[in-house]
Structures are given as C-alpha cells and as structure tokens.
Amino acid sequence: MEILMTVSRIASICTMGANASALEKEIGPEQFPVNEHYFGLVNFGNTCYCNSVLQALYFCRPFREKVLAYKSQPRKKENLLTCLSDLFHSIATQKKKVGVIPPKKFITRLRKENELFDNYMQQDAHEFLNYLLNTIADILQEERKQEKQNGRIPNGNIDNENNNSAPDPTWVHEIFQGTLTNETRCLTCETISSKDEDFLDLSVDVEQNTSITHCLRGFSNTETLCSEYKYYCEECRSKQEAHKRMKVKKLPMILALHLKRFKYMDQLHRYTKLSYRVVFPLELRLFNTSGDATNPDRMYDLVAVVVHCGSGPNRGHYIAIVKSHDFWLLFDDDIVEKIDAQAIEEFYGLTSDISKNSESGYILFYQSRD
C-alpha cells in the first residue's frame, strides 16, 4: 500500500512539474511579470474552498501587500494571520516563477481555530472568506489594543477602548469595508430617516439570464412597507406606510460581491444550486449610491473570481480565475493555467433553469481604479 501511495505521489509531483513548466513557456520569459510568482496550492482533502479564496486574495494587490508587510513586523505568537503571512511570503520569495506550495500550516491552524472547517468535507467558500476577513480584523484590533495598553502607541486612548466605543478600523476595513445606508421615507409626512450599516462583502440575489448590474439594481429596489409591516414614524408618532430602500453610501477599495447561488428548497429539504447565467463585466461602475456618497463615480476592474463547479453547496469543487498584469490565470488547486479573457464567459452559468452541474461565478472581486 505504501509503495502504491509513493508511486502515486511521485506521479502527481511529475504532473505538477510538467504543468508549471508549460505555464512558464506559454507566458514566455519576456512577458513574465517581474517579481511575480504563480504557485498552485496542494489540496488537503476538500480544501479547494480555501485554496480558491486564498488565490483570489493573493491577487488583490492591496491585500497581498498588507499581509506581506505584516510578515516583516516583530514576530508574534502563531495565529491565522501569521500563518497567512508565512504562506504569502513563501509564494512571493520563491526562486522559481511557477510551481506548487502546500498550505499545510495555514490549513492546520484554520482547523484548530474553527470547528466548522475541522473536517474533510466540502465547505462554503463565502463562509470561509467572511470568517477569514473578520478574524484578521479581530487579530489586528486586539494587537492594537495591546500596544496601546503597553504604551507603544502614542496618545493611545485606553479609556476609549474600554468604553465599548467602536475600535479603530484596520487595513482589512480600509480595503474591503463599504457602507450601506437604509433609507425609509414616510408616505404621510415625507420625513426620511436613514441608518448606516458597514459591510466587508455584498450578498446579492441572482435571477436567470441577468447581469451583475441587474442584481445590484434588485438589491436597491424600493420596498413598500404597508399592512402589518407599516413603519413607526417618529415624526407622526404612529405607524405609517413608507418606502424603504438600500443604497451604497461608501464604496470600498475592493468590492467583494457574493452571488447567492444556493437556495433552500422546502420540497427537497436541502439546498440546491441556482446555476443561472449571470453576466459579470470586466469593468463595473456602481450606480445605486446615495446622494451623499463619498465616491459615487468609482470605476472598478474585475481582478478575481471564485468559481463553484457542481450542483450543490456540499458537493462539487471550487477554482479561482485571477487577473495578473495583462492576462488571466486559472487556479485549480495545484494546477495553474493561462486562459483567454473571453474564456471568462464560460463561468457566467447556464441558461437552463434545471439544477445541473455548472461552473459559475460565486464570489467576484472588483478593485477600484483610484
């Protein structure tokens, strides 16, 4: 058995090497970006959900730069961020341009910190992204709090930290955080009240044969509050009919859009995949911003897509397609391939309403030009 496993492993390594060599030849020495590395990640038993998100984040340059900068800070005790910075540093400092790296340390730490991921089952890539970004933000805020208490940050207002005031934003917030404003207009007195809500990613509903722009328009549709759902107006001091809508008040540097492709079907007693065809453009301008938006005309470029392959949330596979400099790459665990920009259309989804196996965009990463 051991001999068979060894032979299988050697064959796998040979395949990885051949793939890496082919990629390097296809890009060519003159076109290969300076100081760039394209490394696949070994799958440790259904960890494609993790590998695909890590590759997408690695090619979100502002995020990569912050993680690598964290590596150069004084050594801290091991946590998910130190493991991530070690992994990114390992990729960025390889002598070879292409190859494969095992993210074993990161996966081990992830499984130790969250029981949701402590198994060999397929997990949801969006849940992992959400957990990772929030965990990194928590780590950075806790470290900042400790530095203030130890007097390493001048004018650190420790009292503020202890009075339940909002902690200082971290570079995770600077990169990914946007703000939504929930506007409610009373139809009796016309008074508008608004409530702000921060987000690190936006989850949008999907419909058949539509586009991301259409999905975002649906996200901001006006809803009428009436009957038993009437709104309590402070001005009228009674429940009134009202119009409610969500708008974007502050756009993030990197906009992460999650397409809600998994829907619970009562008759099946399980989640099924909506393989609907949803077109996502290479360039995006958001239109559903509030009147006092800080940057209403921000233009975005698509830099990465996490793709779900399969028919349901707990089965199937995840891959990532990323833009690096002027070309596109497909990362499928340890395999890395160069693809044409036109090939991205293959990941829009299917025109059939039937739940089938499909390769469809699940999380989109758009980076602001300014």
Swiss-Prot record:
Residues 155-164 have a biased composition (Low complexity). InterPro entries: Papain-like_cys_pep_sf, Peptidase_C19, Peptidase_C19_UCH, USP_CS, USP_dom. Residues 145-167 are annotated as: Disordered. It holds the Pfam family UCH. GO terms for biological process: protein deubiquitination; proteolysis; regulation of protein stability. One of its GO terms (cellular component) is cytosol. The keyword Protease applies. The keyword Kinase does not apply. Residues 39-369 form the USP domain. Zn(2+) binds at residues 186, 189, 233, 236. The active site is at 48 (nucleophile), 317 (proton acceptor). It catalyses: Thiol-dependent hydrolysis of ester, thioester, amide, peptide and isopeptide bonds formed by the C-terminal Gly of ubiquitin (a 76-residue protein attached to proteins as an intracellular targeting signal). CDD domains: Peptidase_C19G. Keywords: Hydrolase, Metal-binding, Protease, Thiol protease, Ubl conjugation pathway, Zinc. Its EC number is 3.4.19.12. One of its GO terms (molecular function) is cysteine-type endopeptidase activity. Interacts with WDR48. Deubiquitinating enzyme. Has almost no deubiquitinating activity by itself and requires the interaction with wdr48 to have a high activity. Belongs to the peptidase C19 family. USP12/USP46 subfamily. This is Ubiquitin carboxyl-terminal hydrolase 12-A.
